[in-house]
């Protein structure tokens, strides 16, 4: 603990300032330090502001296109994950049939997913968007159409 009396105050203050500023300057000016991060954040904010202005300057259908792209990305991700799960279920089911033990039964109706996707895209293209949430459930309403994603799969594990 430093002794701050009238004889040692100046020397302790001098050495502590010299020590702190000696390490503060290299840390902040190397590009990865505090000043580098602030430059990166300023550039990011400028890019985001220009990007937002460009989106709003386009025609009103651009928001429709953004929603459509987002929905198609989400649907493709969902179907790819369902495909991987169905492949895993088939592999485990074959393994279970060899050992005469059924490990997983009835994962869900995945085969009709592409037909559902076409119907959903058709209904979306003819309707307007409004979204509401109630107690954590996401419900998407499109005029007279209400879509709620419900997982169909039920798994049973037998030991």
From Swiss-Prot:
Location, primary (coarse class): mitochondrion
One CC-aspect GO term: proton-transporting ATP synthase complex
Organism superkingdom: Eukaryota
Localisation per UniProt entry: Mitochondrion membrane
Record membrane topology: Single-pass membrane protein
Catalysed transformations (reactions): ATP + H2O + 4 H(+)(in) = ADP + phosphate + 5 H(+)(out)
Keywords associated with the record: ATP synthesis, ATP-binding, CF(0), Hydrogen ion transport, Ion transport, Membrane, Mitochondrion, Nucleotide-binding, Translocase, Transmembrane, Transmembrane helix, Transport
InterPro entries attached to this UniProt entry: YMF19 (IPR009455), YMF19-like (IPR044975), YMF19-like_N (IPR003319)
Transmembrane segments: 13-37
Protein EC: 7.1.2.2
Any matching Pfam family: YMF19
GO molecular function, one term: ATP binding
A Gene Ontology biological process term: ATP biosynthetic process
Subunit structure: F-type ATPases have 2 components, CF(1) - the catalytic core - and CF(0) - the membrane proton channel. CF(1) has five subunits: alpha(3), beta(3), gamma(1), delta(1), epsilon(1). CF(0) has three main subunits: a, b and c.
Family label: Belongs to the ATPase protein YMF19 family.
Function: This is one of the chains of the nonenzymatic component (CF(0) subunit) of the mitochondrial ATPase complex.
Name of protein: Putative ATP synthase protein YMF19
Provenance organism: Oenothera berteroana
Taxonomic path: Eukaryota, Viridiplantae, Streptophyta, Embryophyta, Tracheophyta
């Amino acid at each position: 603990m430093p002794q701050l009396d009238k004889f040692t105050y100046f020397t302790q203050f001098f050495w502590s300032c010299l020590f702190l500023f000696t390490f503060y300057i290299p840390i902040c000016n190397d590009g990865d330090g505090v000043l580098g991060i602030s430059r990166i954040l300023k550039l990011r904010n400028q890019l985001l502001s220009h990007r937002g202005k460009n989106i709003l300057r386009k025609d009103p259908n651009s928001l429709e296109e953004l929603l459509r792209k987002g929905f198609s990305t989400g649907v493709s991700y969902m179907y790819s994950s369902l495909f991987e799960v169905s492949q895993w279920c088939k592999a485990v089911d074959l393994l279970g049939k060899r050992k005469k033990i059924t490990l997983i039964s009835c994962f869900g109706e995945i085969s009709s997913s592409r037909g559902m996707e076409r119907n959903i895209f058709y209904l979306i293209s003819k309707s307007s968007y409004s979204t509401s949430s109630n107690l954590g459930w996401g419900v998407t309403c499109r005029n007279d159409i209400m879509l709620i994603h419900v997982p169909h799969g039920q798994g049973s594990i037998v030991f």
